[in-house]
A protein has these predicted regions:
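S-adenosyl-L-methionine/SAH cofactor-binding core of RNA-modifying enzymes
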Residues: 35-102
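Structured adenosyl-cofactor binding patch, chiefly the S-adenosyl-L-methionine
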Residues: 114-160
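N-terminal beta1-alpha1 ligand-phosphate binding loop
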Residues: 1-31
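Short hydrophobic segments within beta-strands
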Residues: 6-8, 42, 105
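Conserved strand-to-helix beginnings and helix N-cap segments that scaffold or border functional pockets
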Residues: 17, 84-88, 117, 137
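Short glycine-rich anion-binding loops that position phosphate/pyrophosphate groups of nucleotides
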Residues: 11, 77-80, 108-111
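A mid-sequence interfacial segment
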Residues: 87-127
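Conserved RecA-like P-loop NTPase ATPase core
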Residues: 5, 73, 107, 140
Length: 160
């Protein structure tokens, strides 16, 4: 199953970008024997439209165009919270059901277009708090890596 991340906004060169790259590189290595591949990031420009609603609509179009056909997971503070093990198991279920691709969506400063959130196969929350897109990208990359280690029995995850 090919995993992609579509994120509004570009990360500048620096420690945050390096951390995302490091976690996704590890996820690629650990995920390959599990048939979890890709771990691509599509950085999409923030819309310059005049209103928040118009910006979200434009950004949603760019997100849909960037992601391969497949499942969509929108990251939103109003979404469902999952423990790391439950997240890993959900990825495995989708893979075992024969899903070819999954795209994770990280919105911009205005959030994600409500129509895209409603159409998503899952709306996932890391917290009811709002986080900067750079931190969400780091947290998602880490959780994807953690999921691959949980599924492979690697000792990285030491949860209860």
């Amino acid at each position: 199953m090919r995993i992609s991340i579509a994120a509004i906004g570009r990360m500048k060169t620096g420690p945050e970008r390096e951390l995302v790259a490091r976690y996704l590189e590890r996820a690629q290595g650990a995920g390959k024997p599990l048939a979890l591949t890709g771990f691509d990031v599509f950085e999409l420009s923030e819309s310059r439209a005049g209103s928040a609603a118009a910006r979200k609509t434009e950004e949603a179009k760019a997100i849909r165009a960037a992601l391969p056909d497949g499942l969509v997971v929108a990251l939103d503070e109003r979404g469902k919270s999952l423990a790391s093990e439950a997240f890993a198991n959900q990825l495995a279920r989708w893979r075992d059901d024969g899903r070819a691709a999954i795209g994770f969506v990280i919105g911009g400063a205005d959030g994600i277009d409500p129509d895209l959130v409603r159409a998503a196969d899952l709306t996932l929350s890391f917290s009811p708090m709002v986080w900067p897109h750079q931190l969400v990208r780091i947290m998602l990359a880490e959780q994807l890596y953690r999921a691959t280690t949980i599924l492979s029995g690697h000792p990285y995850h030491r949860g209860d």
